[in-house]
From Swiss-Prot:
Belongs to the Luc7 family. GO terms for biological process: mRNA splice site recognition. Residues 237-313 are annotated as: Disordered. One of its GO terms (molecular function) is mRNA binding. It comes from Caenorhabditis elegans. The gene is luc-7L. This is LUC7-related splicing factor homolog. InterPro entries: Luc7-rel (IPR004882). GO terms for cellular component: U1 snRNP; U2-type prespliceosome. Pfam families: LUC7.
Length: 313
């Protein structure tokens, strides 16, 4: 039997129908069992084989047999495991949002760095061109003074071309300064659902592969589950607290009742012991009185015998 088939049987039938060698070492309600897994919404399982599994890692036990045991027990009474599962999902969404913020910040820093480097490079280009323009302007004046009009006009045209080049560089620099993440200068943007970096210049099919991937779909479903559970979480927490409070009150009353019953029995046993001791002391005194009475009668009889003998003599 393959591991997959074994897991399917365990998930359907529960731990009672699993071989002893493969039976979980703890019950489904043990604190080490993942309660989000029991409800089928553990974030770690929602993003399989992706980098987000390290972000939303889960160290609790995931046993298919536990899930079947829980579903069977849940029909008997409400365990309120959705409250614990919500807290797990909420924490996972928070961690992913932190990861997304880090990626976005990195992209923005990269754009700023690239913008600064590009600006420095273009400033250097402009300085070199302006130096050429200054030199050629001096040459134009010299040629004009010498009457070389045709050569002067050629240099003048060249200087105008250099000035147009400077304008093009300055215009492109303005575009870079106003650019941000997601623009043509950055090319990359971050997916707001799962934090993946997307290149907007990629082919549509490649971008579609991302949106259809396990990591993206898993995080979208996790966020949807989180928002849905958030609508009723306050009410569910209140219900659980009321139930736990009722159970604690019942347990206290039972504890007090056992102590009271134990006290009554103790008093009853104490009374019986005291009665028994009193009876023993009474019997002991009676025996002592009888012994003393017999001794007195024997003494009186001996005295009478001695008096009778004395008279005869």
């Amino acid at each position: 039997m393959t591991d997959q088939m074994r897991d399917m049987i365990a998930q359907l039938m529960g731990s009672q129908h699993v071989d002893n060698k493969e039976k979980p070492s703890m019950p489904f309600d043990h604190h080490s069992v993942c309660r989000a897994f029991l409800l089928g919404v553990c974030p770690h399982d929602m993003v399989p084989d992706s980098r987000l599994q390290n972000v939303v890692s889960c160290r609790k036990v995931h046993e298919p047999a536990h899930k079947a045991d829980y579903e069977r027990a849940q029909k008997e009474k409400d365990h309120f495991y959705d409250v614990d599962a919500f807290e797990i999902i909420e924490h996972a969404v928070h961690l992913v949002d932190i990861e997304i913020a880090k990626v976005r910040e990195k992209l923005e820093d990269d754009v700023k760095t690239q913008t600064s480097q590009a600006a420095d490079s273009k400033a250097k280009q402009v300085a070199e061109i302006e130096e050429k323009i200054a030199k050629n302007v001096d040459d134009i004046e010299k040629l004009g003074n010498e009457g070389k009009i045709e050569e002067s006009m050629k240099l003048h045209k060249y200087v105008e071309e250099l000035r147009e080049k400077i304008q093009e560089i300055e215009d492109s620099q303005t575009e870079v300064k106003t650019a941000g993440p997601g623009s043509n200068s950055a090319k990359l943007r971050v997916c707001e659902d799962c934090g993946a970096q997307l290149n907007i210049t990629d082919h549509e099919s490649r971008i579609a592969d991302h949106y259809n991937g396990k990591m993206h779909i898993g995080m979208v479903e996790t966020r949807e589950t989180y928002l849905k559970m958030k609508e009723t979480i306050d009410e569910r927490r209140k219900e659980r607290e009321e139930k736990l409070g009722s159970q604690r009150g019942y347990q206290r009353r039972e504890s007090y009742g056992r102590r009271d019953r134990g006290g009554d029995r103790g008093e009853y046993r104490g009374d019986r012991d005291r009665d028994r001791r009193n009876r023993d002391r009474s019997r002991s005194r009676d025996r002592s009185y009888r012994r003393d009475d017999r001794g007195d009668r024997r003494y009186d009889r001996d005295n009478r015998d001695r008096r009778d003998r004395d008279r005869r003599y």
